[in-house]
Curated annotation (Swiss-Prot):
It is found in: Cytoplasm. It comes from Gallus gallus (Chicken). PROSITE patterns: AA_TRNA_LIGASE_II. Keywords: Aminoacyl-tRNA synthetase, ATP-binding, Cytoplasm, Ligase, Magnesium, Metal-binding, Nucleotide-binding, Protein biosynthesis. GO terms for cellular component: cytoplasm; phenylalanine-tRNA ligase complex. The gene is FARSA. This is Phenylalanine--tRNA ligase alpha subunit.
């Protein structure tokens, strides 16, 4: 069995003289063993965890390395020399010279070194000629010295110039100076990290070496502080609405009057949904203090006598029922308020509204029903809207949500006509499930 990296390091360290002067540089040791430096660093840290087997002191050294551009110059020569060699004895049009690779930098450097001259009055336009017979590529020679490990022989001015031209990089290397510890040994003894039931039962734990606790380790981050799945879905839905040009409606009133929750939406006062078995009514305050008088009169007339193409429900509409406070059963009450305020503006402006908030129902609790849940609401107000516009908007919304297989089924809502239920095909359940309700508001 071949020795491990840690064992190879200990064997090499054993041959070093004792005392503070003896030891190994991790960079030199990695090169001598033919290993990647990070692999050797891992072995050093493993040996440090064993106790006083070794001592490791962190050191930092700086060295110069060629950049990607520097590697190119080392291989092909500097831009100024390449341009000089590209200029024939009869000269070269400046426009052609500028098309060569690295010509911009090469031309300025060659002109500064007085290797080339520019004749602006030459026939056919400015022309470049050689000003000397031959040149030496000092930049390439300097980079070759760095590549061969002799970068220290370069002057500070030469290094600064190469660095400014982005041909040279100053790299800081972190390494370790490794020495023998007080408990040095070439044999690596495996330390136990877990106390198992078998060790306790057999008593073998008494003779086994255990790894000491590392109280400086960060440990695993605690699994807490995550967003609730409902908040994640809410954020996703909100982003989809905003991408489609919708504006969020204010929905900060969990307590709503029966007028806005039911009556303004053409829901009769004898409707089963308004019964205490389906709705949470408030005892204090039991009634809403104010309702818009003119609008309430129009709503009362439509319920009692009809209007706007409707026959009404033909019953005695009571303001006492409309004033009753409740926990809103849907956020469509917010849509009714928003449309009411839109109508009062005088000049009509097309709008798109949405809301995502809690609603409350006096439901029997089971696996699929809660007394409190979230409703996603969207409303579009414009002239000339049709059922096709509604279906297109729904298709766009659900497609952004990742639901593309949709079906629309005719339905009845008190406040919309026509109305549709929206179904999506569930790949897991292998059936169509209802995902929404929709319709065109009665005018």
């Amino acid at each position: 069995m071949s020795p491990s990296v840690a064992e190879l390091l200990l064997q090499r360290l054993e041959r070093t003289p004792p005392g503070p002067e003896g030891g190994l540089c991790s960079l030199e040791a990695a090169a001598a063993l033919g290993l990647d430096h990070q692999t050797l660093v891992g072995a050093v840290k493993s040996l440090q965890a064993l106790g006083e087997v070794i001592e490791a002191e962190t050191r930092a050294t700086t060295r110069w390395e060629l950049s990607a551009e520097g590697e190119e110059v080392l291989r092909d020569g500097s831009p100024e020399v390449r341009l000089f060699r590209s200029v024939p004895s009869e000269g070269l049009p400046q426009s052609d010279a500028m098309k060569l690779p690295g010509a911009q930098v090469g031309f300025s450097k060659a002109m500064a070194n007085k290797w080339l001259r520019l004749d602006k009055g030459a026939p056919g336009g400015p022309r470049i000629f050689r000003a000397v017979d031959a040149v030496q590529d000092v930049v390439q020679s300097s980079l070759r010295q760095v590549q061969e490990g002799n970068g220290g022989s370069l002057s500070e001015r030469e290094r600064t110039d190469l660095k400014r031209r982005k041909l040279l990089l100053e790299v800081t290397l972190k390494s370790y100076w490794i020495r023998k510890g007080s408990a040095f040994s070439t044999a690596v003894v495996r330390q136990e990290t877990d106390l198992t039931p078998e060790m306790i039962a057999t008593g073998s734990w008494r003779k086994l070496p255990f790894k000491a606790y590392n109280f400086s380790a960060l440990g695993l981050p605690p699994t807490c502080g995550h967003l609730h799945p409902l908040l994640k879905v809410r954020s996703q839905l909100r982003q989809i609405f905003l991408e489609m040009g919708f504006t969020e409606m204010p929905t900060d009133n969990f307590v709503e009057s029966s007028f806005w929750n039911f009556d303004a939406l053409f829901q009769p006062q004898q409707h089963p949904a308004r019964d205490q078995h389906d709705t949470f009514f408030l005892q204090d305050p039991a009634e809403a203090p104010e309702l818009p008088a003119n609008y309430m009169a129009r709503v009362k007339k439509v319920h009692s006598q009809g209007g706007y193409g409707s026959q009404g429900y033909k019953y005695e509409w009571k303001v006492e029922e409309a004033r009753k406070n409740l926990l809103r059963t849907h956020t469509t009450s917010a849509s009714a308020r928003a449309l009411y305020h839109l109508a009062r503006q005088g000049k009509f402006t097309p709008v798109k509204y949405f809301s995502i908030d809690r609603v409350f129902r006096n439901e029997s609790l089971d696996a699929t029903h809660l007394a409190e849940f979230h409703q996603v609401e969207g409303v579009v107000a414009d002239r000339g809207l049709t059922l096709g516009h509604l279906m297109g908007t729904l298709q766009q919304f659900f497609t952004k949500l990742g639901i593309s297989k949709l079906r629309f089924k005719p339905a009845y809502n008190p406040y919309t006509e026509p109305s549709m239920e929206v179904f999506s095909y569930h790949e897991g359940l292998k059936k169509w499930v209802e995902v929404g309700n929709s319709g065109v508001f009665r005018s």
